[in-house]
Amino acid sequence: MLSVREFSNISMIKGPLVYVQGVTDASYNELVEIEMPNGERRRGLVIDSQMGIAIVQVFEGTTGVSPTGTKIRMLGRGLEVKISEEMLGRIFNPLGDSLDNGPPVIKGEKRDINGSPLNPAAREYPEEFIQTGISAIDGLNALLRGQKLPIFSGSGLPANMLAAQIAKQATVRGEESNFAVVFAAIGARYDDALFFRKFFEETGAINRVAMIVSLANEPPVMKTLTPKTALTLAEYLAFEQDMHVLAILIDMTNYCEALREISAAREEVPGRGGYPGYMYTDLATIYERAGKVIGKKGSITQMPILTMPNDDITHPIPDLTGYITEGQIVLDRALYNKGIYPPINVLMSLSRLAKDGIGEGKTRDDHKDVSNQLFASYARAVDTRGLAAIIGEDSLSEVDRKYLLFGELFERKFVSQGFNENRSIETTLDIGWEILSVLPESELTNIKTQYIQKYHPNYRGKK
């Protein structure tokens, strides 16, 4: 660790950045203390150092910082936050300062928030089902313990509500007492941050949730620190306290916009869409901190949530996120306009690991077959809607009309559910069987006969 060094030669102040001359030994992400002439102290991080100039990103912003009379101290270490189990049920900013008028964290250990992605050789393959209580996720795009499964939303879609509902309901069945949620609100508007806080407090979910919050009006560096602090806490709870942790990061678009703002202030050559060329690497250092480690009981499951600008799934942020993570849950504006909550487009959604965490001994023996049949039948229902719009519903065959009915029931009964409705996987699969029963049995080609005879409403009623 480097010793503390003091400098006073500020060559330039630009946006959230301070340029300090005469620095030859600064480390990347080194913590800096800035003492102003009036005695006020601020903190920052070194984000670049070359040709004797260190660029410092100031946490509290540079308003009021004077080029003369200001002392810059390089502290010789990274940003460390005191981490503890006491943070569950509390709200903090990315620097570890309390935002709920509660006491500071007393017990715990200081940890550098710049953690590393998990070593691939140390990873254990995800195989255990996490029940979110959301049918469109549990039934068709299951989330597994240790998985990275993002939610792609659009502006004005109810991503906040869905994130809060998952944070309240998600659990590893049989290990409910050992489950915790680390909720990172990145660059949140004040009313959104207040919504999350009130929701968790009123539902009692706050007891197992630790909130790390940065607001929209804070400097960009605070937004880039938020997921790092949240994941440092998640790592401590998972790998030191043996807890199953769900890390929800909302909104990663704000994180990427902060990266772009800092990059522009540094006058870097922009990459695709004006975002820095290293954004893919930067996102990977966050997403790859999730997973299961061989020999450890705990795990980190990650659900990053992002807003697709102009609902464009090919935009750099969702595009790069999709490359790194293991699937995506896509919210759909057309479903939202039909009054369906959550408006999850199951045909565009995917969980790449789902097949390994469902079925006999994990959820229910018919889960895989029912999931495959629901996908296939809904895809045909959507195609049939397009056909009906051209030739008219009266020209459709009897079977095609039943697929139209199935599509409507699928959206209204299976995908749509109440904000406070927590469905077990058994309830989800039973609803799936109920709506599949409107189709002729001969159409259920993806389901084994033994499951049809065991779970189909026509047979269950005869037992």
Curated annotation (Swiss-Prot):
GO process annotations (BP): proton motive force-driven plasma membrane ATP synthesis
Primary localisation category: membrane
Pfam family, one: ATP-synt_VA_C
Top-level taxon: Archaea
UniProt keywords, alphabetically: ATP synthesis, Cell membrane, Hydrogen ion transport, Ion transport, Membrane, Transport
Gene3D superfamilies: 3.40.50.12240
An MF annotation (GO) of this entry: proton-transporting ATP synthase activity, rotational mechanism
Subcellular location: Cell membrane
Family as reported in the entry's similarity comment: Belongs to the ATPase alpha/beta chains family.
NCBIfam families named in the record: ATP_syn_B_arch, PRK04196.1
Function field: Component of the A-type ATP synthase that produces ATP from ADP in the presence of a proton gradient across the membrane. The B chain is a regulatory subunit.
Protein name: A-type ATP synthase subunit B
Record organism: Saccharolobus solfataricus (strain ATCC 35092 / DSM 1617 / JCM 11322 / P2)
Gene name linked to the record: atpB
